[in-house]
Amino acid sequence: MIKLSRLIFLIVLFYVFLDSSGQFYNGHKMRFGKNRVQYSDFYWEFYRYDKFDIYFNQFGKELAQYTADFTRREIPRLERFFNYNLDKRIIFIVFNKLSDFRQSNIGLITGQDEYNIGGVTTISRNKVFIYFEGDYIKFEQQITAAIARVLINEILYGFELKDNVTNSTLINLPEWYFEGLVSYVSKGWNFKIENKVKDGILNKRYKKFNRLIGEDAVIAGHSFWKYIADTYGESVIPSIIYLTRINKNSNSCFLYALGFSLKQLSYDWMSYYLDLYKDAQHHQSLPEADRILKRPRRKRVYQQISISPDGKHISYVTNESGQYKIWLYNSETNKKKKIIKREHKLEQITDYSYPVLAWHPSGRILTFITEEEGGIRLYYYTLATKDLEVRNFQYFEKILDYSFSDDGSLFVFSGIKKGKTDIFVHTIASGTYQQITDDYADDFNPEFINNSEEIVFSSNRYSDTIGSEINNRRKALSHDLFIYDYKNGDNVLTRLSQDRYSSYYQPYELDKNRFFVLGDKSGIINRYVSRFDSTISYVDTVVHYRYYAKSYPATDYPRNIIEHDYNQKAGKLGEIVFNDGRYYMYNQPTDEALIRAGKIEPTWFRKAFTKKIAERDSIENIRRKDLSIQSIQDNTIITSDLDTFVFGDYQIDINNYIFEKEKINYYNSKLKDRNITLSLDTAEKGRPKIRIYQTAFYQNYIVNQVDFSFLNESYQAFTGGAVYFNPGMNLLFKIGTNDLFDDYKVTGGIRLSPDFNSNEYLISVENLKKRLDKQIVFHRQSFKNTGEDEGEEFTVKTHTHELSFIFRYPFDQVRSWVRTLTFRSDRTVFLATDINYLGKANIYKTWAGIKVEYIFDNTRSLGINLPNGTRYKFFGELYQQVNGGFDDLAVLGVDFRHYIKIHRNLIWANRFAASTSQGSSKLVYY
């Protein structure tokens, strides 16, 4: 340990005293930057409502309409929650999937990073983007989060420019405060949130509350705001936010609003959840002997576990900050092998929806579906030859899950098409597909069962009839299992009803009429063995059956099972459980998985959730019943008094009993048989006309700061002095504007020195709409410097005018090829400091140049001036004087930097930089 400390000390000492004469340009302020790659052309349209606009591309009309309908209901609710009315119109930008958003330029910072972030004011806070993941519940949560974000920003920072400039420079909120509040408002409390809160509380990861970052900060903040709401009431939250704006501080606002300091509240918050979860460990312990990996990495998310038909191999996916890898684990040798690695670790929203894995029934081929270059690709990996075959999978926006038929000629999948998540069957030989469902219900986890004659899947559909219009208007409050008769193509699904307000996912056929499923019946997502059965419902001319499912718990874990997989041929089951901040994978034989766990007591949240959802369901049924009766009265033409239908006139038929929830539909059908009705389609009522988006610019940011650097990188003209001129203290002002999608950006800047002798002006215009990014930069710089000629000092003022055309071609998000064409004019003026220089002629030089760069940059920001990762560039430049002289200059250089995080706010930075020049006007390096 002592030797290691000495080694680190010597390395630090070496770097401290290392000569830095290899600096060029502005030294450390080299231009790097990440990219957005456009693979598709999007044409944007929008709906305009009173309080919001919704922009969508040519493939997203259905999503935009769903967004509009939900937003019209949600804005008034959130305005009541925050006790604040929106002053600024919300601009929604709807993407069909996250991969489409990654092609956009929204949020992209081009050029060099801001090294001096003081005085930077962001203006636009009302523009939000949302994307569809295949689950409308998550989509609605995104919409709610977007509205809440805009409302909170307006309360804190105001909506006028003067308020933004004043408040944004003074209010700096921790991540747990802002993002935690947005998460609480948008997601409420659910089984997945509680699972992570419980894990963080019991494993003491949230002990240092104010030091949390990333997901831990969001989840801890979410639970903190729930504690505030449960203890003091939700009505205090708007007061806390308002006091935050007044006091410009996130600590004192709690003291003024609640009478307790944030420190005291954090203790009370921790005690509150420790008391709730004190009995949480009274469950089966997680299996220790069946772990696939003894200690998985904390930063990695493990998912898509899949067991091969022979039981020898287990495939799974790891995802770390957006970079995913597919692994093959040999259960006989306990060795793992990486098949592919895709994408990079970047500071962006991670898409966990792909890749999706499935084994071919032969056991010799592992297949997986990914999203690449804006499209969907299906890969076949042959274990024997290690060959990788790829096919494009067209006509779908996203594939969420899939599985093969017994003979491997078909696979059934859950896919997104036109904003709807439905079930499809794909024929591999012909490349065609058959659509099974087509509605707004969310259909997940399809599997072939019963010798591939039927398909079981999980869905929140209200009606069990395919094509029923009610599934487009109403969804169930939980997910049930449904069976589709694929052999006969029956449009009536078989619903495997269990508990009314419990959800069941990921069904796998154990044997005939028995399944492994995941369910949240107890408040913790455990595995159940579900048996499908039927009983006689009633008899008329034929026997009618009612189908149901009975289940018993096979696990009683203290944490949720995130996902599981069962292979009937192998007789093995795999599962992933999140515990102690890690994702643990397990592999069990069937006989162990079938052991009954005993009776599971529901958690406190399960009881509260069931009560709340039952009340909501009852109110919704009453509301819809009233609407249905009113609709009959409004839309029915009564032909005679005798046609009037009285509900009480009908007797109960014991052979055809009508349940309460079906009564109103039954009566409606009776009325329709006896009356002429006018069906009024009100779906489009009140929908504004579609408008075409025209490019318009919005003010984006303002910079007002004291600075010590130049606006633009540029070689300085040599004036005979031995000093590289630095501008010293100066006043910097920059303003940026861009269009709605950040495709076009205009930036203007001015730097003024105190003596007005060394000033600088810059204007930049960028076009990022296509894959080839284009930029025009005009830069004017003047500086005063001294020189020496034959022992006599003189003073010169140099004026440089530079026009650059920059073309940037991105290979992916981190690699790019940059070419720059430059025209430059230097004018050197000798100041009349004495008689010798009074009549000395000015020197004019005009240059034409070209610069080529290869740039790699995968750094992530851990904070202000705290990068983590690697960035480097290779560059070459060639300049030629074009105004009569024959001076030329050629430059080659490299700049390599690697940043390593060694503590929360401490990094180890390594840099290697080198440059050389050739020609008649060589560079002078200082």
Per-region residue spans from a language model:
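Juxtacatalytic substrate-recognition/specificity segment
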Residues: G22-N167, P174, F191-K192, C253
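Blade-terminus and WD-like Trp-Asp/Gly-His loop motifs, strongest in beta-propeller folds
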Residues: I305-H313, L357-I365, Y402-L410, P446-E454, ...
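Outer-membrane beta-barrel translocator/channel fold
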Residues: S463-G467, N471, N560, L772-R819, ...
